[in-house]
């Protein structure tokens, strides 16, 4: 018979190494999805396909979430569960594609909806921001826009790996970036 203290201890050990990977690309087998799967295979981390969740953007409300988080008209769409997993993780890795020189729209939905999760509780925001985060931007263009967008998610400078298909003789739309051993090594070195 397992004692409760053993179960709690086992749970703590698992939680000590908990990594979460958030894939923001809507492409099922594109570079971001394949990168997220590669990292999950290397680390055992859970992958959340944010774009596939159908998370609603902010809007069609009167800012009820700023008064009480549960009052957000979109709480049933799963966004708060994603934020909770990030907040409880030991590390979160974001994999974000470039759409027209900026992170994709799913990234901005993710950023917007944090207002409802944090509400007026600064302690939750502090805990969320304190979680170590790494960012992988699949982009052939503007790095500065990613640095600014990711900077809101961390205390200090964001830790970003920029992967440009053109640097490896690839075409982004082909989704074959992770077929290159140099890319795999670069990702492994970044993840640690």
Task: State where each predicted segment sits.
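A short, structured active-site edge motif that brings together acidic residues
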Residues: 49-55, 127-129, 164-167
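Short, glycine-/small-residue-rich phosphate/pyrophosphate-handling segment
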Residues: 123-163
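Short, intrinsically disordered/low-complexity patches at protein termini
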Residues: 112, 117-118, 126-128, 169-170
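Short, charged/polar "capping" segments at the starts of alpha-helices
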Residues: 29, 142-147, 170-172
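N-terminal beta1-alpha1-beta2 submodule of the flavodoxin-like/Rossmannoid cofactor-binding fold
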Residues: 2-119, 177-192
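Glycine-rich phosphate/pyrophosphate-binding loop and the adjoining helix
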Residues: 151-192
